[in-house]
A protein has these predicted regions:
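Bacterial N-terminal signal peptides
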Residues: 5-16
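Signal peptide processing junction and immediate N-terminal pro/mature segment
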Residues: 16-23
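Peptidyl-prolyl cis-trans isomerase
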Residues: 24, 28-31, 39, 60-216
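His/Glu-rich zincin catalytic helix
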Residues: 43
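Short, surface-exposed, low-complexity cationic segments
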Residues: 46-60
Length: 216
């Protein structure tokens, strides 16, 4: 579940100038969903859409993003109840650096960031929240994921070797790739368990989606 790593920015509404006429004021935000006694705003969807556009060069539909935000709400509430610690500044900086180095060049990173409209503060908040949620899910589900040697070998033969051949490269040895394969399979297992947990959690919650009304 890749969705679950991304922050929810509750952007404040900026009041209009008191000296201005009522006709000049306009609604700048709407409620996209109610989850229990909380709300998710249309601006939250827009913020996550901009972040996806920045990281991936494209974004999901509003409905898909809303589902991700509901998932994030559940994880955030559970992490809060568990008093799960927030990431340290050094961890946030490391994650930000990983985002930067995922681009071919600094120029492309800056250009994409400018295109998305994200400020440095918004970027940091997004990355911090993503790290917090993903770390909580890791701590909750990792111990329950067991990977046997046969599964690692199968993944090596069916995924690693063919991918290397398709790129005209020599595949690493199984032993050289073992740790990386195991971690990838553990992450897949965490995602699978988290997905099942989220489905069960949503079934117990009062969730009212108002996205169609919010976009009118």
């Amino acid at each position: 579940m890749r969705g679950v790593a991304i922050c929810v920015l509750l952007l404040s509404l900026i009041p209009g100038n008191a000296a201005g006429s009522a006709a000049r004021q306009e609604t700048v935000d709407r409620i996209a969903a109610r989850v229990e006694n909380d709300i998710i705003l249309l601006s939250d969807i827009r913020a996550l859409s901009r972040y996806q556009q920045f990281v991936d060069g494209k974004s999901e539909s509003d409905a898909q993003i809303l589902d991700r935000l509901i998932d994030q709400w559940i994880v955030r509430i559970e992490a809060g109840v568990a008093r799960f610690p927030r990431p340290f500044d050094a961890e946030i900086e490391h994650s930000l650096e990983r985002v930067r180095t995922s681009f071919p060049s600094t120029e492309e990173y800056e250009a994409r960031k400018k295109q998305s409209g994200l400020s440095d503060a918004e970027m940091r908040e997004m990355v911090s929240a993503q790290l917090y949620l993903s770390d909580y899910l890791d701590s909750r589900f990792r111990a329950g994921v067991q990977i046997d040697p046969k599964t690692i070998e199968d993944f090596y033969q069916k995924s690693v070797v063919p991918m290397a051949k398709s790129r005209g490269q020599e595949a690493p040895t199984l032993e050289a790739a073992r740790d990386s394969i195991q971690e990838a399979l553990v992450q897949r297992g965490i995602n699978d368990q988290a997905d099942r947990w989220l489905i069960e959690s949503k079934a117990r919650l009062h969730i009212e989606k108002l996205l169609d009304e919010a976009t009118k």
